[in-house]
Amino acid sequence: MYDLLKTIDDPADLRRLDRRQLQPLADELRAFVLDSVSKTGGHLSSNLGTVELTIALHYVFNTPDDRIVWDVGHQTYPHKILTGRRDGMKTLRQFDGISGFPRRSESEYDTFGTAHSSTSISAALGMAIGSKLNGDDRFSIAVIGDGAMTAGMAFEAMNNAGVSEDAKLLVILNDNDMSISPPVGALNRHLARLMSGRFYAAARAGVERVLSVAPPVLELARKLEEHAKGMVVPATLFEEFGFNYIGPIDGHDLDSLIPTLQNIKELRGPQFLHVVTKKGQGYKLAEADPVLYHGPGKFNPAEGIKPSTTPAKKTYTQVFGEWLCDAAELDARVVGITPAMREGSGMVEFEKRFPERYYDVGIAEQHAVTFAGGLATEGLKPVVAIYSTFLQRAYDQLIHDVALQNLPVVFAIDRAGLVGADGATHAGAYDLAFLRCIPNMTVMAASDENECRQMLHTALQQPNPTAVRYPRGAGTGVATVKAFTEIPLGKGEVRRRTSQPDGKRIAILAFGTMVAPSLAAADALDATVANMRFVKPIDAELVQALARTHDYLVTVEEGCVMGGAGSACVEAMMESGVVRPVLQLGLPDRFVDHGDPAKLLSLCGLDGDGIAKSIRERFLSHAADVASPAKRVA
């Protein structure tokens, strides 16, 4: 099994193969990807769709001297396997294992780290210009998907690239008719009409030379009609940017891919190759449902993904989705917005029930935020469902277009804190720090499912921009209450009180997901625990009261410490004139790698044992002195 694949330890081995061996190699590589992902979990559909393209690129180009930048990067498992990491696939996305995304520190073949969308053309152009300035003669290649082409950054880069006539730059559009959610927008809908009559007539001589090795024009026209729904933008548009447009060609046909790429190597200036692929290619279950198989956990390939038979705790994403539908049913002004993450953000049901108030704006976070601001000016109640890590991409719009005008936009911030297998690129480590410094913002952190629901309701009632952050995955098992209750603005609650005498009284001020482990630590230490709820406005009265009645304060948050929620507590304490020793716990000042979420929290000292250990080491010389019965406040 894998007789050919076992001989490939780097692309130089691949380039020694006869062309007739490449399709059998592709079959082995696809089977290996399926087998590997079924055992570890990971991104599947996208990787099954890039097997032949990956082989062709490494076969034709002299990697790593020629640079390949993979946009988003979750489709790079075939690339990793062919570049010396075949055996490492058993550790994929596990702690101390290989990353699920390109990583410069992992391999010289990973020329640029990616995970967020639409960055590849900018990076590849920088490499191409840098190569030219250094006197090197190498190609820089950006592989970008149809979904990623909806983002403004991709077009900004193409606008810049089009005037770089002597840059050896190739942009490959991997058109697979599927981003994570289906591609949206007018460019998608009208491609066939705009392109079909003009592409060949406008083709330059260089393009015609490349096409001479591809299928005949009539066959291309047939393929164009077949795949029109998945294509993103017309050939004429790319040519207006200054690119030679080539394609579309079948991205699973090595006999088209390889000679086309070989001819492109002889051309100068920016080239644009349009390849049509199919997500899930070669595995019928993934072909039929590429969304289900986008990022599965472990499963049996022979049986496919089976629904769990054990009752699962409700996820925070589900809590949000249910709340949004309930809120929209009660108030016709509620509008839901997602930047291309309908499934991931829990908006599938909302789209079905309220299609006229559902807006998927594509991978366009900047537009999503300003669009929401515009809706708010018309008296609507926009809710932007967005991952914490992707909100970073719209920071100026958040400040300039929403907060500066004090517009009532709700930001439902999913994937706050550590996210596990996706690692540092997707972690929501910074939102508390970068939100609390913005005037007019209200910022809340949910500690359980029902509190999340009620916080979202509270946010919708505010006359200013308001954010509610919540983590990835299942909650604590707390049942949600159907009836809505508005949480008093800027007010936390004491969940447990210490019985320790003066001199040993510790108060833990916990935010969001850190309430539960803080309570566990407090049981071991007999400490007071406050669920702070609000990062902004911070409950200054509660902070100051705890400072007056306790000897030591500890703040705990699942976010960066610098400028975060703990800093808000320290500021409030200092204003009171009562100064106590403070220990601020949170994510370390480094990028936290991928791995099991519970293990990562433990390594960061943010589980119950870790919090207790840090408190003992900082404040308590004799831990046995603080053992006493727990007292919790309901």
Swiss-Prot record:
Q: Which UniProt keywords apply?
A: Isoprene biosynthesis, Magnesium, Metal-binding, Thiamine biosynthesis, Thiamine pyrophosphate, Transferase
Q: Which SUPFAM superfamilies match?
A: Thiamin diphosphate-binding fold (THDP-binding) (SSF52518), TK C-terminal domain-like (SSF52922)
Q: Where does thiamine diphosphate bind?
A: H74, A115, H116, S117, G147, A148, N176, Y283, E365
Which residues are in coiled coils? none
Which residues are Mg(2+)-binding? Answer: D146, N176
Write down the SMART domains for this protein, in alphabetical order. Transket_pyr (SM00861)
Q: Please state the pathway this protein functions in, per its UniProt record.
A: Metabolic intermediate biosynthesis; 1-deoxy-D-xylulose 5-phosphate biosynthesis; 1-deoxy-D-xylulose 5-phosphate from D-glyceraldehyde 3-phosphate and pyruvate: step 1/1
Q: How is the cofactor bound?
A: Binds 1 Mg(2+) ion per subunit. Binds 1 thiamine pyrophosphate per subunit.
Q: Which class of enzymes does this protein belong to?
A: transferase
Which reaction(s) does its UniProt entry say it catalyses?
D-glyceraldehyde 3-phosphate + pyruvate + H(+) = 1-deoxy-D-xylulose 5-phosphate + CO2
Q: GO cellular component annotations, sorted alphabetically?
A: cytosol
Record-linked InterPro entries = Dxylulose-5-P_synthase, THDP-binding, Transketo_C/PFOR_II, Transketolase-like_Pyr-bd, Transketolase_BS, Transketolase_C, Transketolase_CS
Tell me where on the tree of life, at the top rank, the source sits.
Answer: Bacteria
Question: What Pfam families does this protein map onto?
Answer: DXP_synthase_N, Transket_pyr, Transketolase_C
The molecular function terms in GO held by this entry are: 1-deoxy-D-xylulose-5-phosphate synthase activity; magnesium ion binding; thiamine pyrophosphate binding
Task: Name the Enzyme Commission number(s) assigned to this protein.
Answer: 2.2.1.7
Query: Could you tell me which Gene3D superfamilies the record lists for this protein?
Result: 3.40.50.920, 3.40.50.970
Q: Which GO terms describe its biological process?
A: 1-deoxy-D-xylulose 5-phosphate biosynthetic process; isopentenyl diphosphate biosynthetic process, methylerythritol 4-phosphate pathway; terpenoid biosynthetic process; thiamine biosynthetic process
Q: Which cofactor does it need?
A: Mg(2+); thiamine diphosphate
Q: Which family does it belong to?
A: Belongs to the transketolase family. DXPS subfamily.
Subunit structure of this chain's protein: Homodimer.
Summarizing the function annotation, the protein's role is: Catalyzes the acyloin condensation reaction between C atoms 2 and 3 of pyruvate and glyceraldehyde 3-phosphate to yield 1-deoxy-D-xylulose-5-phosphate (DXP).
Q: What is this protein called?
A: 1-deoxy-D-xylulose-5-phosphate synthase
**Organism annotation:** Burkholderia pseudomallei (strain 668)
Instruction: State the organism's lineage.
Output: Bacteria, Pseudomonadati, Pseudomonadota, Betaproteobacteria, Burkholderiales
